[in-house]
Amino acid sequence: MAITASMVAELRAKTDAPMMECKKALTEADGNFEKAEEILRVKLGNKAGKAASRVTAEGVIAYHSEGGIGALVEINCETDFVTKNDSFLAFTKAVAEGIVKNNPADVDAIGAMALSLDGFGPTVEDVRKGLIGKIGENMSVRRFKRFAGSKLASYLHGTRIGVVVEFDGDETAAKDVAMHVAAMKPVSLSSADVPADLVAKERSVAAAKAAEDAAKAQAEGKPVQSAEIVAKRIDGGVQKYLKEVSLYNQSFVKNDKQTVEQMLKERATTVKSFTLYVVGEGIEKKADDFAAEVAAQIAAAKAA
């Protein structure tokens, strides 16, 4: 069967796999899209298994608001293929809606919420287990945050980044802040709010760099900076870092001639807090070796 450019484009849109891989998979599958998707899963899984240091995880960020209450949730799965699955997307949407309506105490409590979907139910946990069997991949609700009592502005960058801003003032300005947070990923509102462990880590890095520079200067017979100058360099590096990672001090993405704080003041808006979710942030995805897995299965079958 002749493989057309439109077929390749369609498979790429569904899987996000490289164009050449899509063409090869369609050729091997003789134009059968379902079979081509399975071929891609095997090929890409094998490649991913070789990337032992790869840090990532797949999933979707969903947001729902109703009656002044909002919910941001991250639901994880094993591969990028499933993030485009209609049933999985419907599940994430339903969970976000359920969090708004039911106000669960924690992630475990989400499983007990009422839900019927795709013939599975009557709880979220029942639907989750049913979809695992149907789709063939594990999935889990990783984290969520429910918002109530404040004006809310949100921004979703596809399904991989989600931001919610609690604010007073101009809604358009707050939405601009949400988009800015998604792009610049600050860790706190102000420099004073940056977590102590991050500050300590940055100070340690700056001190190590200063020590390295001193050793290099000494080895080359050049003057070594005094302890006082070194201390000022370290403090300067830390202060620069604090400005770079705090929302108020960052240059506003839509106008780099002013800081976010200046923009907010100009538009009479106050940001109370922001919440940023990035899919897979902080999760190390297991690097599976597909060939080794197959070999293990064959060995197990022979031993049986």
Curated annotation (Swiss-Prot):
Taxonomic source organism: Polaromonas sp. (strain JS666 / ATCC BAA-500)
Q: Which UniProt keywords apply?
A: Cytoplasm, Elongation factor, Protein biosynthesis
What is the official name of this protein in its record? Elongation factor Ts
Q: Where is this region: Involved in Mg(2+) ion dislocation from EF-Tu?
A: 79-82
PANTHER family, alphabetized: ELONGATION FACTOR TS, ELONGATION FACTOR TS, MITOCHONDRIAL
Tell me the function of this protein: Associates with the EF-Tu.GDP complex and induces the exchange of GDP to GTP. It remains bound to the aminoacyl-tRNA.EF-Tu.GTP complex up to the GTP hydrolysis stage on the ribosome.
**Which InterPro entries does this entry report, sorted A to Z?**
EF-Ts_dimer_sf, Transl_elong_EFTs/EF1B, Transl_elong_EFTs/EF1B_dimer, Transl_elong_Ts_CS, UBA-like_sf
Q: Which CDD domains match?
A: UBA_EF-Ts (cd14275)
**Similarity remark:** Belongs to the EF-Ts family.
Q: Which gene encodes it?
A: tsf
What Pfam families has UniProt attached to this entry?
EF_TS
Identify the GO cellular component terms for this protein.
Answer: cytoplasm
- Asked if the keyword Acyltransferase belongs to this entry, the reply reads no
User: What are the protein's GO molecular function terms?
Assistant: translation elongation factor activity
Protein localization: Cytoplasm
